[in-house]
Amino acid sequence: MAAKIRQNDEVIVLTGKDKGKRGKVTKVLPNGKVFVEGINIITKHEKPVPALGKAGGLVKKEAAIEASNVAIFNPKTNKADRVGFRFEDGKKVRFFKSNNEII
């Protein structure tokens, strides 16, 4: 199955505490989760690791968000959009369903 959301796509969050925020997908996991730049920031308590020269303390980092909770952002319409697939010149391409433009 082809992925509707891929790395480096600009997405908008549909639900949750970050609803309405936009960001770029940095990583896509096979279990249906994505990491989005600047979205779903959590605070982790990390222990110091003297052997690696790592200081401990509170570290803010991005957590994964369910792929169903984000939608690809269409810059032409300035809205969230759905993704479709079609074949052009023998290649499978993704397109925005609202204006049939290739992503």
Curated annotation (Swiss-Prot):
<dbReference type="InterPro" id="IPR014722">
    <property type="entry name" value="Rib_uL2_dom2"/>
</dbReference>
<dbReference type="Pfam" id="PF00467">
    <property type="entry name" value="KOW"/>
</dbReference>
<dbReference type="InterPro" id="IPR005825">
    <property type="entry name" value="Ribosomal_uL24_CS"/>
</dbReference>
<dbReference type="GO" id="GO:0006412">
    <property type="term" value="P:translation"/>
</dbReference>
<keyword id="KW-0687">Ribonucleoprotein</keyword>
<dbReference type="InterPro" id="IPR005824">
    <property type="entry name" value="KOW"/>
</dbReference>
<dbReference type="GO" id="GO:1990904">
    <property type="term" value="C:ribonucleoprotein complex"/>
</dbReference>
<dbReference type="InterPro" id="IPR003256">
    <property type="entry name" value="Ribosomal_uL24"/>
</dbReference>
<dbReference type="InterPro" id="IPR041988">
    <property type="entry name" value="Ribosomal_uL24_KOW"/>
</dbReference>
<keyword id="KW-0689">Ribosomal protein</keyword>
<keyword id="KW-0694">RNA-binding</keyword>
<dbReference type="Pfam" id="PF17136">
    <property type="entry name" value="ribosomal_L24"/>
</dbReference>
<comment type="function">
    <text>One of two assembly initiator proteins, it binds directly to the 5'-end of the 23S rRNA, where it nucleates assembly of the 50S subunit.</text>
</comment>
<dbReference type="GO" id="GO:0003735">
    <property type="term" value="F:structural constituent of ribosome"/>
</dbReference>
<dbReference type="GO" id="GO:0019843">
    <property type="term" value="F:rRNA binding"/>
</dbReference>
<keyword id="KW-0699">rRNA-binding</keyword>
<dbReference type="GO" id="GO:0005840">
    <property type="term" value="C:ribosome"/>
</dbReference>
<comment type="subunit">
    <text>Part of the 50S ribosomal subunit.</text>
</comment>
<protein>
    <recommendedName>
        <fullName>Large ribosomal subunit protein uL24</fullName>
    </recommendedName>
</protein>
<dbReference type="InterPro" id="IPR008991">
    <property type="entry name" value="Translation_prot_SH3-like_sf"/>
</dbReference>
<comment type="similarity">
    <text>Belongs to the universal ribosomal protein uL24 family.</text>
</comment>
<comment type="function">
    <text>One of the proteins that surrounds the polypeptide exit tunnel on the outside of the subunit.</text>
</comment>
